[in-house]
From Swiss-Prot:
The chain crosses the membrane at residues 31-51, 74-94, 109-129, 162-182. It is found in: Cell membrane. Glycans are attached at residue 52. This is CASP-like protein 1D1. It comes from Glycine max. Residues 1-30, 95-108, 183-193 are cytoplasmic. The lineage of its organism: Eukaryota, Viridiplantae, Streptophyta, Embryophyta, Tracheophyta. It is a multi-pass membrane protein. NCBIfam families: A_tha_TIGR01569. It holds the Pfam family CASP_dom.
Length: 193
């Protein structure tokens, strides 16, 4: 005894063949933010590297004394970390562009983007913190330790370059937080409710 009710069969077929929600597609914003991260990394590196300054210091006799980023390990780490960030942002921008027309690949890339973006955020934050600490010592000095005097009143150009570079790196870390948030939200929007 077969049922002649076709209405029940069509309801079952339509509900089972409904595709999973596609989620909101933010890959255009992802590509833009990754390009902005590259630009911020590049600008921060160029600004700190070009901030060299030489001043004549009056010790027993006048001596030219240069200030360069490579004389401070914290600034060298800062340049290296932001260079890695720039390279990473180029690679992930290209990956985002490549995956922009492939929905299955987009979904697979999102967890990896979150993981690697979080790692890069840690690198940017640690580099910015170490460079910021040394820059603060250059600006204010430390009267409790002999030899840690202020230098920014003498090396004003160098200190301005360091400060601007740190500010741009902080902006880059905010962009990285936005990238993590965007990827997490994209994954969340793809989960069926």
């Amino acid at each position: 005894m077969a049922s002649t009710d076709k209405h029940g069969d069509t309801e079952y077929r339509t509900s089972s063949s409904t595709p999973a929600p596609a989620g909101v597609d933010y890959f255009k914003f992802d590509v833009i933010l990754r390009f902005v991260l590259f630009a911020a990394s590049l600008v921060a590196v160029v600004v700190i590297v070009t901030g060299n300054q030489t001043e004549v210091i009056l010790v027993p006799q006048p001596v030219p004394w240069p200030a360069k980023f490579r004389y401070t390990p914290a600034f060298v780490y800062f340049v290296a970390a932001l260079s890695v960030t720039g390279l990473y942002s180029i690679i992930t921008t290209l990956a985002s562009l490549f995956a922009s027309n492939k929905p299955a690949l987009k979904t697979k890339l999102l967890p990896y983007f979150i993981l690697w973006d979080a790692l890069i955020l840690g690198i940017i934050a640690s580099a910015t913190g170490t460079a910021g600490g040394v820059a603060y010592l250059g600006l204010k000095g430390n009267s409790h330790v002999v030899g840690w005097n202020k230098i920014c009143h003498v090396y004003d150009k160098f200190c301005r370059h360091v400060g601007a570079s740190i500010a741009v790196a902080l902006f880059g870390s905010i962009v990285t937080v936005l990238l993590i948030w965007l990827s997490a939200y994209s994954i969340h929007s793809r989960v069926p409710k």
